[in-house]
Amino acid sequence: LVALDTEFANR
């Protein structure tokens, strides 16, 4: 999964 990783990085 990368949703969490992307969300965190986006923040």
Swiss-Prot record:
Keywords: Antibiotic, Antimicrobial, Secreted. Optimum pH is about 6. Activity decreases sharply with increasing alkalinity. One of its GO terms (cellular component) is extracellular region. It comes from the Bacteria. It is found in: Secreted. Optimum temperature is 30 degrees Celsius. Active from 30 to 100 degrees Celsius. Antimicrobial activity was completely lost after treatment with proteinase k, or high concentrations of chymotrypsin, trypsin or pepsin. Also inhibited by isopropanol, methanol, acetonitrile and chloroform. There was no significant loss of activity with either lipase, peroxidase, or amylase. GO terms for biological process: defense response to Gram-positive bacterium; positive regulation of defense response to bacterium. Has antibacterial activity against L.monocytogenes. This is Antibacterial peptide AN1. It comes from Limosilactobacillus mucosae (Lactobacillus mucosae).
